[in-house]
Amino acid sequence: GAYSPSRLIGEELEKKILNKIINPTLRALKDLGAEYRGFLYAGLMIIDNEPYLIEYNVRMGDPECQTILPKLNTDLFEIFLACCNQNLKEIKINWNNKKSLCVVLCSKGYPEKYEKNVEIKNLNKIELNSQDFLFHAGTIEKEGKFFSVGGRVLNFISLSDEFLKARENINKYLRKLNWTGGFYRKDICLLYTSDAADD
């Protein structure tokens, strides 16, 4: 799972990340004459308030994408178009101030060998709040029933003013599911969020 915003990153750490990792990377690309337009996703490890780069991806992360994009108020197509046309500075990107929490449901055994074609019962009975989302990742539908066919299967996302409320919303949905072949982590968002509480 994932959550946003991260309370791990404060202003000081953000400056370190920009000055030690992001800006030098962008300068190096420019010096090499490498024109790049798109996502640059930095996978970081933070040790003693120092950032270390683990990897770069030229795509959004999963489930980071599902967690962050629901907070975006600006039309995503307009952002992509501005990026392609090299005029990102001309558009204003607006975000809402909600807290976002994503819990990923996985097939038993994942990330190793996992069960497939296990029915996920009661999924069609879940009624989402207006600021909550359900993204399918590893499911198929057969005759009105849903079955798991992947490792990461479902993503429940909730936007709220408080992380605790977002967790409560997601837990409400999870309690309705009857899926013997699935599991999820219950500690997402607990470590760095003072307003989050145990289930």
Give a label for each model feature:
Residues N73-L81, S100-Y114:
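C-terminal catalytic subdomain
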Residues G1-G61, C65:
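Internal nucleotide-binding/catalytic subdomain
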Residues K172-K186:
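Short arginine-rich
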